[in-house]
Amino acid sequence: VAAGLVGAHPVLFQAMQAALAPGGHAYLDVPTAIISKRPGQLPRLSGPLALGSSGAEDFLLEYLDDKPMQDVAWGRLDRAGIARLLALHPLAYTLTARPAYIADRGASALADRIESALESGPKLTVLVGHDTNQALLAGMLGLHWSLGGYPADDPPPGGGMLFLLSHDARGTPYVTLIYQVQTMDQIRNLDVLTMANRPAMAALPIAFCGHRAAPTACTLAGFTRMIARTKTRVIAR
């Protein structure tokens, strides 16, 4: 499967080859594999997709850190080139985080904590995690997004999932999920975020909710049942 993804995106991987080692060692010749060293460990990749995903993220971090462009990817990429190669990052997650079997196990504890906060927590609960946590939640909840100039479904640095609880006129509680990211240049320039210079935001449909009153709203009861079903699947498997 991993080798098939490499073969399906030749232009993207050739562009990464040009950024990493133009005229040098062909990293595309390295065998591609999915690795899991021990039970309970999230799978990892080896080969071109692993190198491409981590390399693209490294180039992004160099750009966000406001390094001179001659020091970003050895001066071989501009911002558009970085954004293009960054598509390798979510591509890797289609194998290591988004599949249901992996996502259910990797995100169920975090989803349970989110559910608890929505049902009986304080008005504001802040949970700090990693891009992998977001990719796992996305796989578990069936989330997809494209905003801020990043590739589709890429969880960039500083991205946040906002689970908002509201009530309709009858008092029925609903969960709305907002995904928020700062653009590359907002982070690179340390922009002050204001109403006139906002981060990119989008309300995401929770595809696996099952009881959606609107495309981007899920009843709290439906959200709770969805989390319960996920935990049941994890135990059953």
Go through the PLM ranges and name each one:
Residues 1-125, 131-237:
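Signature for phosphate-centric chemistry
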